[in-house]
Amino acid sequence: MKFTFKSSFTILLTIFSIFLVFLLNEEGEIPILFNLLTFAGIYGLAAIGLNVHFGLTGLLNFGHAAFMGLGAYVTVLLIPHAAGREGVVVTTGLPFFLALLIGIISAALFGLLLGLPAIRLRGDYLAIVTIAAAEIFRLLVRDLESVTGGVYGIINFSSSLQQYRLGFIDNFASSNDLNPSQIWVAFLSWTSIILVLLLLRRLTNSPWGRALRAVREDEDAVRALGKNAVWLKLQSFMLGAGIAGLSGVLLAFNYGTIQVSTFVPILTFYVWAIMILGGVGSLTGPIFGSIIFWVIISETTGIAQLIF
């Protein structure tokens, strides 16, 4: 990361934001801090995926919630769970990490399917298509109650992930009066961020990454050089969608339930706000942007009631 004035200011603002959490909460600082870090990790991961779309390639995606939701629903439906108004119990399923892999791939493939007809569109037209796709996804999930649980959602799936919880998580949680399930999700979220950033750093410094930035700056020039700009944008769309799918899974396991009301348009705009706060096009910017965003949310009581 190159430390310019902008990046240094963002880091200082992030540190100040965390300090503000302790300053404004006289009791229970540690639980509040870890609640903030959990949401910051999950949404930061989602913003990294969006940054691949817009910051790296210049694609206006306003349907990010659909990618998050698809990854979450596919993963949860493939493991033991209870769904719908009647609480229909499914006792068999795949191992969690295999289901997670399928969920991520499903989100990436949805990015491919959405991108095939839409990726040739530019600017506002692509934004409109992605918003429409996200709403179609949400309505389908709501209406397919026999599969997705509809408005009643899906519950009793958290044990598939929690059974892999590491011992030091329980020790740390018990010594600090924290929820071990949430600490485990927070640990996985920030571990995922590190792994994804390492992958993206390698990719963005490769010829492929430079080609994506060229598409963002001047797509016609890329075509003139003999590069397939459409295929490059599709690859970017798939990669960002897969990362979003992973963040959606973590969001579902943090709540312990998955409902259609979670993956609404406002979720996409939260992720956009985080990306912009951290700096569009910056690999690590979404992390700082997410922390700043969630400090603002947690310390603004009226808004926090809408989220928590």
Positions of PLM-derived features:
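Small-residue-mediated transmembrane helix hinge/kink sites in multi-pass secondary transporters
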Residues: N51, V76, G115-L116
